[in-house]
UniProtKB/Swiss-Prot annotation:
Name listed for the protein in its UniProt record: I-Kappa-B like protein F2
Pfam families: Ank_2
Spans of repeat ANK: 54-86, 91-121, 125-154
Species of provenance: Microplitis demolitor bracovirus (isolate Webb)
Name of the gene encoding the protein in the UniProt record: F3
GO MF term set: NF-kappaB binding
C-alpha cells in the first residue's frame, strides 16, 4: 500500500482532472479522509482548493446527494483551508446552493450554522440559495435560511408569487 504522504504529495490530477481528495470525498467515507489529516500541510493544502474538470472543488463534491458523511467531510476540508462559500466554475453554486437544489435539509441547517457562511451569494444564474429553495417550494429550507437571517424579498417562482419577509 502506498503511504498517504506519497499520495498527497502527488498532486497530478488523473484523467478526470481529480486529485486524491476529490476521489476520497466522492467515493470514500470519513475514515478514508481522516487518514490524510496528519498529511495535509502547507505544501499540499492546495489539493482541497483544486477544481476537477467538471469545475468542482471538494466542498461541492461532498455537498451532492449520496455522499457519505458530508458534514464531517466538510469540517475536515475547512480545517485544510477549503472555502465553505466557494463557487463551482460552471454554475457558480456554493455548497449551500447545492443543498437547496437537492433539498438536503440536514446539510443546509449545518451549513447555515457555520461561521463565515454567506447565505446571500448569487450563482451565475443570479440565484441565491433562498431563491433556489423558493423555486422548489421548499418551505423548510426557506425557513432555515430565514431563521439564520438571510435577506428575503418577493420572488416569482414557477408562476406563483411567494411573499416572504425577514423575521
Amino acid at each position: 500500500m502506498v503511504p498517504p504522504e506519497e499520495i498527497a504529495s502527488a498532486s497530478n490530477p488523473d484523467i478526470e482532472g481529480e486529485n486524491i481528495l476529490h476521489f476520497l470525498c466522492r467515493e470514500g467515507d470519513i475514515t478514508d479522509l481522516m487518514a490524510f489529516k496528519n498529511v495535509i500541510s502547507d505544501a499540499n493544502r492546495h489539493l482541497a482548493l483544486q477544481f476537477n474538470r467538471h469545475g468542482k472543488q471538494c466542498v461541492h463534491i461532498v455537498s451532492n446527494p449520496g455522499i457519505a458523511d458530508p458534514q464531517e467531510k466538510l469540517k475536515l476540508l475547512m480545517e485544510w483551508g477549503a472555502d465553505i462559500n466557494g463557487q463551482e466554475r460552471v454554475f457558480g453554486n456554493t455548497p449551500l446552493h447545492i443543498a437547496a437544489y437537492t433539498q438536503n435539509h440536514k446539510l443546509a441547517t449545518w451549513l447555515c450554522n457555520q461561521p463565515g457562511i454567506n447565505m446571500g451569494i448569487y450563482n451565475y444564474l443570479f440565484k441565491t440559495p433562498y431563491y433556489v429553495a423558493c423555486e422548489r417550494h421548499d418551505l423548510k429550507i426557506m425557513n432555515i435560511l430565514r431563521a439564520k437571517g438571510t435577506r428575503c424579498g418577493v420572488y416569482r417562482c414557477r408562476d406563483a408569487w411567494l411573499f416572504t419577509q425577514k423575521y
